[in-house]
């Protein structure tokens, strides 16, 4: 006789594996922004971040998301940590 747990497993359908189409596709602006942010921190930048609540149309972000961005450069030398 088969154990009840094994019979139950045979009756349940297998969970489908998510396809590559189910994964979110980050846009180029998001990837470029993150790359610039990491390069700025690694290069001894001023370390100042601000939160932007505005979103670019078609960015794929949900409404109300907060995006951390680096402020525009004001020239001069970077701050020394």
From Swiss-Prot:
Keywords from the named record: Secreted, Signal
Signal peptide bounds: 1-22
Subcellular location: Secreted
Lineage top rank: taxon: Eukaryota
Name assigned to this protein: RBAK downstream neighbor protein
């Amino acid at each position: 006789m088969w154990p009840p747990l094994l019979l139950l497993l045979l009756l349940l359908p297998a969970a489908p594996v998510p396809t590559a189409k189910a994964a979110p596709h980050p846009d180029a602006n998001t990837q470029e922004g993150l790359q610039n942010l990491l390069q700025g921190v690694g290069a001894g930048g001023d370390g100042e971040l601000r939160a932007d609540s505005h979103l670019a149309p078609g960015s794929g972000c949900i409404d109300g998301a907060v995006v951390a961005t680096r402020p525009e450069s004001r020239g001069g030398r970077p701050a020394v940590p």
